[in-house]
């Protein structure tokens, strides 16, 4: 998937997926995350966007795609939390389903994915900014979140517990990489 198209292997034939808005001279398509949102066995796409400030998913047309590979996918809004540069899928709550972690500019949150629903959980705002990573930073077997100036330590229950901010570093123009996850 790239923008408004999907590419069929093995020849990588281009097919229409959806219209992508152009907002203030830029395509509003910052991150496409593969996820079967509605549980029908087909891979849908979750889209994280900067200019429209929207988080939405586009529903795979299912069997209809076999007859017409250019069948448009249906857009379904999840939320409009604010501008997002990218997003990550990771199982933050350990329930076996990937959750959505948007890279918010001016806000920080994650969306618990539960049986086709998305439940928003706020995070400490220090995480917001340019860049996000997910991994076990401190070796406690929980997925922590890394931001541009530090990292958030995941609590035992990421849905209800307090995420602890660690202001560990400051990224500068020298491209230093203080934490790898």
Can you annotate each of these PLM segments?
Residues 1-181:
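Beta-propeller-forming repeat regions
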